[in-house]
Structures are given as C-alpha cells and as structure tokens.
Amino acid sequence: MEKEVIVLNEARKVTLTAYLQDVEGEFGNIPKRPGILVLPGGGYQMCSDLEADPVAFPYLKAGYQVFVLRYSVKKDALWPQPLEDYDAAMDLIRSRAQEWKLYPDKIAVIGFSAGGHLAGAAATMAKNRPAAAILGYAVLNEDVKGCNKSAPSVVDAVDDDTCPCFLFASRTDNLVPIANTIEFMQALDRHDISFESHVYAYGPHGFSTCDSSVQDKDTNMCDRIPDWVADSIGWLKDVLGDFGKGSMTKPVCGHYASGDREAYLSVDCTMGL
C-alpha cells in the first residue's frame, strides 16, 4: 500500500491523504478498485483524528482505495469553501483515476457530524457528486447554523439527482438531534432516492467506528452500533457493484426506490425502504 499526502490549498491548510492499494498481480481479480472519500467531523472547527484514519482502515480492508480530506475549518469554513475543498478533492481523484487504479464513477463519500453535513452537501449540491454517500450522525438541517452560520441546510437541497445514501445515528445523540437524520430520510423519500438507515436506540455523539481505540472506557452505547461499518460496506456493494470478479458487477440496488424509474432494482432494496 502507498500513502500520498497532497496539499489542495496551502493557505487554508486543506490536504488530501490517499491510501492506495495494489491491483492485479496477487490481486488477479481486481484490475481497478472503487474509492471512498472520508470527511471527518469536528463542528467545522477541526477535522477529528478519530474520524479520519480509523474510518479509512475498514474500507481499505474491504478493498477500497481510500482518501481522507482535511477541509477548511474555523474562519476558513465560510461557505462554500468547504464544499469547494470537496470538489477540488473529487476533481483530483477522478483526474488521477487511471494512475490510482480507480473506477472514476464508483467513488463514494463518508462524513461524520459536520463532515456529514459536508458529505450531504456533496451528495446534493456539489459540482462533482459522489456515486453514494454515507452520513454518520450528520447535521443536515438548519441546526448546522449552530457550528457554521454560513452553511446551508442540506435537507432543503435534496433533489432527483441526489445519490443513494446510507444514514446512521443514535436516538439519544445529545449534540445533533435525531431529527436531522429523519428529515433527510423524508426528503430522500419525497424524491424517490434509494436509501438505507440505522437509528440505534442509545449512544453518544461522535462514536466513530466504536472501537475501544476511539471511545472512552465508560462510553454507554447500544451493542449493535459497531455494525454500521459492516452494514455500510455491504450497502456499498449493493449500490456500486462488486469489484472482485475481474470487473465491476451490476448494482443490485438502483438510484431510485421506484421500479418504474430504473431498469433494475432488487426486491430486497425496495422492501427495505
């Protein structure tokens, strides 16, 4: 595996870290890989280390090329600068897809808390939208004004071109109310966008992957919260296709929830919405 750190904006300290795995050779069934771009949380005041590399590693293990974006924060988070950082990162990733052995149309985004807001914005209003979005305890409605007064509601931006989404959150999150996740799901439903959602009965804000390395020893949370990691990886295979069979297979779950909107759609996906 290779690691490369690229400065996207020196003045705003915006960097993209690429974790790149080999293809072919011993990975004979993998000529290229899908990718995922990680957007850590931190209230637009920082990019949390707990939601950066610890999140990247499970997706690396699942076979993805993984990228971590440290976007504009604090005074530099004036909107739309964080979204411009995302677009610059996605531009670069797609422009180097051949070099980095990537499927350029199979790049997802994952974000947490304020990073989840940015991931939601990427899914709904970016110049270069991702193929899929994973939103963890994300601030998606007007609550975002509490950490970044210039940032828009993502709920209001959902449209027919929004990509499929996977959402997870805790019912007892005391920082980002669960209404953010619910309202975003409702907006996706109104536009017939395919989604999967997991709202856990109890747990704190900012649980990341839930490993002991990223949690306080006395953290009280639902035992099933760590399942979101494996569930999201399985969901990505549903919406992007499988890549370990010599080429990308056809997705089993389409962009839209209605079978009338697509040439293919799985029964399981339809019944899960």
Task: List PLM regions with ranges.
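N-terminal cap/lid segment of alpha/beta-hydrolase-fold proteins
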Residues: M1-P31, L83
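Short beta-strand element of the alpha/beta-hydrolase
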Residues: K32-G41
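Catalytic nucleophile-loop/oxyanion-hole region of alpha/beta-hydrolase
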Residues: S48, L69-P104, D223
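Short amphipathic alpha-helix adjacent to the substrate-entry channel of hydrolases
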Residues: D49-F67
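Primarily recognizes the serine-hydrolase "nucleophile elbow" in alpha/beta-hydrolase
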Residues: A88-D160, T249-K250, G254
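Short beta-strand/loop motif that positions the catalytic acidic residue
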Residues: D161, L167-A169, D173
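Conserved alpha/beta-hydrolase "acid-adjacent" motif
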Residues: N174-E183
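C-terminal catalytic histidine-bearing segment of alpha/beta-hydrolase fold enzymes
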Residues: I193-L273
